[in-house]
Curated annotation (Swiss-Prot):
PROSITE patterns: MPN, UPF0758. CDD domains: MPN_DUF2466. This is UPF0758 protein TTE0897. Residues 108-230 form the MPN domain. A motif (JAMM motif) lies at residues 179-192. One of its GO terms (molecular function) is metallopeptidase activity. Belongs to the UPF0758 family. It holds the Pfam family RadC. Keywords: Hydrolase, Metal-binding, Metalloprotease, Protease, Zinc. It comes from Caldanaerobacter subterraneus subsp. tengcongensis (strain DSM 15242 / JCM 11007 / NBRC 100824 / MB4). Zn(2+) binds at H179, H181, D192.
Length: 233
């Protein structure tokens, strides 16, 4: 689209308007900015919806800016406001839920890569550490995935009581621990290994086996079991 992006979208040639392009060709042909423009619906007095969308996802920011930003932070951007910010966050959350419902339902875990692939896009851009528990039945199929804590991972924040309460309520046979490193580097810290040790020991007492601890970075993940950081047997 080589037109001046400050002109109103309705003044663009019919075949260049994002909504009409989506109807005719499908969503896969639209740019990220065009898809965002459809979500926010309108621009501002200064710029149209496409120009506004491009400002949101500059090369430095990318799509992860929308994922990581709060409603308030998005709303403070000129031309966005509360209504558009809420639409954007709702779209992100729907995408996250759809991904989990289609990939997680009756999903059998056969390797650490299964968990990494399942949670990578949800967790790779998070600005804080999120500690999750993947709960499995006796056939290693996912029952549920629950966020236990948000913040720097340490033994005071991740308490066995909270971890295994969720697993017991779901009648889980075993669990896999998962958390992200906002730095993008999934290499385990000493604290990561200490948390793992504590939870494995608690699981052995309760009869709920901790199978692994997976750390998500930016585009790659690490299994503490696979890499030999801790003996889960």
């Amino acid at each position: 689209m080589g037109e001046d992006l400050n002109i109103r979208i309705k003044d663009l040639p019919y075949e260049e308007r994002p909504r009409e392009r989506l109807i005719k060709y499908g969503p896969q042909v639209l740019s990220n900015a065009e898809l965002i423009a459809i979500i926010i619906g309108t621009g501002s007095r200064r710029e149209n919806a496409i120009s506004l969308a491009q400002k949101l996802i500059t090369e430095e920011r990318g799509l992860k800016f929308i994922v990581n930003s709060s409603v308030e932070k998005l709303a403070n951007i000129r031309g966005i406001g509360i209504a558009k910010a809420v639409k954007l966050k709702a779209a992100v959350e729907l995408g996250r839920r759809l991904m989990l419902s289609t990939q997680g339902e009756n999903f059998s875990v056969t390797s650490p890569e299964d968990v990494i692939n399942l949670l990578m896009e949800e967790m790779r851009y998070l600005s804080k550490e999120h500690f999750k528990v993947v709960m499995l039945n006796v056939k290693n199929k996912i029952i549920a995935i629950e966020t236990i804590s948000i913040g720097s991972l340490n033994t005071s924040i991740v308490h066995p009581r909270e971890v295994f309460k969720a697993a017991i309520e779901r009648s889980a046979s075993s669990i896999i621990l998962v958390h992200n490193h906002p730095s993008g580097d999934p290499t385990p810290s000493r604290e990561d290994v200490e948390v793992t040790k504590r939870l494995v020991e608690a699981g052995n007492i309760l009869g709920i086996k901790v199978l692994d601890h997976v750390i998500i970075g930016d585009g790659r993940g690490i299994s503490l079991k696979e890499k030999g950081y801790y003996d889960f047997e």
